[in-house]
């Protein structure tokens, strides 16, 4: 029987807790193995890597970087491309733009071996947009590349579906949303904003990319 291996790329704000959750609930989720890729060997990240390995995840690094990690006491089990091609599912949690680059340079190359590739909200165009409980019916077994939309897009889509679409899709005419979030995630020590900041609207039609993503999300259901 084929082993179910989940490979997470990136150990930042999204990647680190996700890897930990997958390890902790491995049996309940029916996962045989969790692997993760770390790009840079950083002293400040050692405790994070040690914890993830202790919880059962296996570390993968770029070919040629093994020595850098070992110098800091981190022992890689896998090489980057090896970890990708042996996985059942890839979850890309890298910063904006990196997921698209990974798709072009690595994921498409191994698309005949890996069942599915998931990327985060910033990777517009990576694949079909998806939000849990919103457009589940739009998913198809042929959808190999999926973009999990951002938290703000999830919020707007959930409110829209609950208030305007639950009974009849024709109820939705227009919606205006204001999203307020904390200054930083706990794992983000830089660029802290100690007071409210209002951002510019970068999308002429929808205002923000979150709203545009929400519209694209509902378009998968044939609504827009």
Describe each region flagged by the PLM.
Residues 2-182:
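N-terminal Rossmann-like NAD(P) cofactor-binding subdomain of oxidoreductases
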Residues 169-224:
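C-terminal substrate-binding/catalytic lobe of Rossmann-fold NAD(P)-dependent dehydrogenases
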